[in-house]
Amino acid sequence: MKVLFVASEAFPLVKTGGLGDVLHGLPQALHGLGVGVRLLLPGYRTLLRQLDQVRIVAWFDVRGAEGPVAARVLETRHPGFDFPLWIVDCPPLFDRPGNPYVDVTGYDWPDNAERFAVFARVAALLAQDAHEAGWLPDVVHTHDWQTGLVPAFLADLPARPRTVFTIHNLAYGGHFPHGDFLRLQLPAHWWSHEGVEFHGGFSMLKAGIVYADAVTTVSPTYAEEICTPAFGYGLDGLLRSRRHKLHGILNGIDSATWDPADDPHLRARYTAGRILPGKRRDKQALLERFLPAADEAALQAPLVGLVGRLVEQKGIDWVLAAMPLLLAETDARFVLLGSGQAAYEQRLTRLARQHPTRVFVEIGYDEALAHQIEAGADMFLMPSRFEPCGLNQMYSLRYGTLPIVFKTGGLADTIVDTNEASLADGSANGFVFDTPDVAHFVDAVRRALALYRQPSLWRRVQQTGMRLSFDWRESAGHYLALYAADSAGEPDV
């Protein structure tokens, strides 16, 4: 089987979030299972600068907003991938500063509709082997709104590969005005309520849902949630009507990169069979980074970690509301790494100044520190209001750092609340609250702090989490089964 992945980012070449991690881990795992893989990416300036040797495999003139747009397709190899990469090199659309979707001031590029429509047109041509390279995919797997037009361009062709569209976050719909639809000269028959039209404009994400042969999202619970008005962003009715072709497949993690037994970022390594000595040394190293005079009392106190975007979706407002209370009534320390809305950054920084021996804050992102927090913290906060899949809770389980999460999306699929029943059957691996407010979040943290004072039970729950597997190979197996069933024309995979 041959699969063409089409996406707007992939780690380590370009990454703005979890999408980039998936577009590294999943294709790599499928390649390891014997699938022929190609990955198509836009030729961003920062991406092209990382490539050493490239060869031109195709030239296309495709329709843009103001007429034909010339695009080269480059083939290259990169140490991060075990298969060839294809890059759409179109300097007027992609050779620019800023990140893939926004300019240096943080605003969306005004021509995003054209950028990703052109990218999708090129992808559709490659999927038909229009460049006559002799590599014709059986499946084209597209990801998020930036690639939603690819299944639409392919849908009406008589002989074509099957298409799969993955929703990583329904909150980002790729919405554009009707004027862009007209300027791009998109097919007129798409413009309907049953097509891409959405509240007077059009949605590239909706195009993927409507025209793909199969639609997936990144956890079973999120697949259920997005079919409801609370999580559907106006597309829940469409998703309910497509429920027979909507599949929730849990993301995996890079088990080699996130491995406490072999992590180069740590002072000490450890395993599920021998947690305490190594994790204690990593906790000490983490404390010493922020508190050089850390004493035994600090080492014995619970250390609570957080790594993530400082935005409301991630529940950072609940964390900020809870911390003064927890600082007053417990001896817990907090270490937080992230960036986001300026108001939240400022409040955290102010809290750290007020409690310099108990609250440690790093604004920004530091890969090594992220690993060190996962290893050195005792528990990990992830109270997201919604979380399509989430990765950090799986990293935390692997590092014996018990997650405290809200019951939503992939968090609900991976974390089992610690209570009398789950302790008895051995499934407990973290702490879950299911009412979205500060009081219930605080209650979950208190329960975690109470269990921390029972070392034998705490160790048992740590070991349960560390022995779980979230390797990408398991997720890849589910996708491979979907590809095979969908290619065979089975509608209810």
UniProtKB/Swiss-Prot annotation:
Pathway in which the depicted protein is active: Glycan biosynthesis; glycogen biosynthesis
Give the EC number(s) under which this enzyme is classified.
Answer: 2.4.1.21
Reactions catalysed according to its record: [(1->4)-alpha-D-glucosyl](n) + ADP-alpha-D-glucose = [(1->4)-alpha-D-glucosyl](n+1) + ADP + H(+)
Fetch the InterPro entries from UniProt: Glyco_trans_1, GS/SS, Starch_synth_cat_dom
Q: Which SUPFAM superfamilies match?
A: UDP-Glycosyltransferase/glycogen phosphorylase (SSF53756)
**Could you say which residues bind ADP-alpha-D-glucose here?**
15
- Establish whether keyword Lipid metabolism is in the entry: no
- Gene3D superfamilies tied to this protein: Glycogen Phosphorylase B
Q: Molecular function (GO) terms listed?
A: alpha-1,4-glucan glucosyltransferase (ADP-glucose donor) activity; alpha-1,4-glucan glucosyltransferase (UDP-glucose donor) activity
Keyword annotations for this protein, in alphabetical order, are: Glycogen biosynthesis, Glycosyltransferase, Transferase
Query: What is one process in the GO biological process aspect for this record?
Result: glycogen biosynthetic process
Function text: Synthesizes alpha-1,4-glucan chains using ADP-glucose.
> Which PANTHER family does the UniProt record give?
ALPHA AMYLASE DOMAIN-CONTAINING PROTEIN, GRANULE-BOUND STARCH SYNTHASE 1, CHLOROPLASTIC/AMYLOPLASTIC
* HAMAP family hit by this protein: Glycogen_synth
Family stated for the protein in its record? Belongs to the glycosyltransferase 1 family. Bacterial/plant glycogen synthase subfamily.
What name has this protein been given in UniProt? Glycogen synthase
